[in-house]
Amino acid sequence: MIKKLLRVTLVIGLLLLASCTPETEYTHAIPKNASVVIGMEVDDMVHKAGLNGQEGEKVLTQLKALVKGGLQGEASQLAERIIDQPSESGLSFNDKVYLFATPHAEAFGILAKVSDEGKLETLIEMLEKESIASPLREESGCQWTEAGTALCAFNNGTFLLLQPSRGNASTMKGTLLSLMRQKEGEGFCALPEFQKIEVEGNDMASVMNLSAIPHEMTTPLRMGLSADIRLEDIKYFITANFESGKVVVNSESLIQNPRILSFFDTMDQVIQPIQGKYLDYYQGNTLIWAGGKITGKELYHILSFNPTIKQKLDNPPLPVDVESIFSSIQGDIAIGFDRKSSKKFLFYADVTNSDFLKTFEDLRPLLALTGGQITLDNVGSHDYMMDTYYGKYWFGVKNNRLYVTTDRTWAEEVGRTYGVSIGRKPWASEVKTNRLYASLNMAEIPKYRTKVTGDSSIDYAINFLRGSCVFLNVSMTDWRHGKAELVLKDKDTNFLEWLVSILKK
């Protein structure tokens, strides 16, 4: 069964190598309420992956052996013809392949253009002989079949694959045929955001909103949201481009809800462009660095409008005056995590005064009741060490800088700058053009730790990436625009070509 499903997946992947006519009627089949729609420039991506040259032939040879494994006679010959000449599949995708998801990830779909209905029918019949697909049935002006856990339908212009996230594929039949019957103006392509996906120049372009999140995860997300704000209102346009030595993802807000717009316009005043004061206060081998610039008092008041957050601010684990701490912060903030231990960190923030430290002095009578389980010691005129259940914390104010750290040496060296610092990184100049900036130093992920998160699949990915990547950076110029960039050690090879070379091994 697994082998059959693998062949279905590989065949669908092969279909993405096909060419297509300039007609776009097939886009009518995208559901209007889709929570995620992704348009892929398959032809460009195949070229960037280096699958058109001699190296590509080696990959296709390996692919032939994998796909043909277990196939006999005509089925084996057809599989080889499709790999050699993708148009033999009956599908054509030089323009775009579309992937989509329905609200709350209840179903996923792949949409493509049919160039030759007869050839596609032959392909489906071959899958039927291999017991991968059910016999073709004709209904509502199209033919459809059940293949594994998915349903497929096609006519003389459109190929649609639909797969539910749970349950039997046959339950999606009504939805499948309904989408195949959609006309101009009835589907997602009638919405203005679809035109952004259609603009050329991106390898992948997508529009997505928060209704894509599964039902079980929406309740905590909606806590504190106004009743007139729907998850569908929070939507973004996201692009991905595969370049030499890196992949770059950009995001742009498509939010139109007046309440949300007003909130984020206010946040633009509270979270301001970073000055970059603390770049030289962290060593160059810091594992994670993040920075921003905030007006703490205004940020506290904004956060307090959310009932859930306000409850946490009003009832912290220790009875300290959280508002006074926030209100003292005015300017750059930064935090760095050590490459050998995620529990070892150093936080800095510009502050206007140290008056808020009195709130910790007021804790002493309460801490005395813990029988020594939590202690607070003075280690300087405005410096403290708190020993808690979770470890030791050093904090205080020096030269109008609040610091918090879990390391004694870092506490003793507060204010120290380094010659080989974060400020020497190639991306350091970008920090000052953003309001938020974070960097993961991939090369410094502990090489001796095979278990990083405890999740085997995530750990495998991390261990795989750390040997090939330099850094992963995420930034925001304002609330409307964000960027993520994963950079390889190999600066000359396109990211997709590098990925294919890994798969070959």
Regions found by a protein language model. Give the residues of each.
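Beta-propeller and related beta-repeat scaffolds in trafficking/envelope systems
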Residues: 358-385
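Structural boundary/hinge residues at secondary-structure and domain interfaces
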Residues: 20-132, 138-146, 189-239, 243-343, ...
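Flexible loop/turn segments at secondary-structure boundaries
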Residues: 296-299, 355-356, 410-413
